[in-house]
From Swiss-Prot:
CC cofactor: Zn(2+)
GO cellular component: ribonucleoprotein complex; ribosome
Disulfide bridge positions per record: none
Quaternary structure and interacting proteins, as annotated: Part of the 50S ribosomal subunit.
Residues reported to bind Zn(2+): C16, C18, C38, C41
HAMAP family: Ribosomal_bL31_1
GO molecular function ontology, one term from the record: metal ion binding
Cofactor annotation remark: Binds 1 zinc ion per subunit.
GO biological process annotation, one example: translation
Domain of life: Bacteria
Name of the gene this protein is made from: rpmE
Protein name per its UniProtKB record: Large ribosomal subunit protein bL31
Keyword set includes RNA-binding: yes
Amino acid sequence: MRADIHPKYQTLVATCSCGNVIETRSALGKETLYLDVCSACHPFYTGKQKNVDTGGRIDKFKQRFSGMSRSIKR
């Protein structure tokens, strides 16, 4: 096997915009990494998800096109 073909594996500090700091190891080649979201502030992980009500859109679509039917004969 060849020696020295693997990248250096070093400590990486990932800092989120919410202030959460995560220390991990990586072969990225940087000492710091800045994140927009992490598990501490992402809505999926915090349970603060917003459900979009698409039922109103579907009803509006059906109402708009309910008059059209396949009654056109050729």
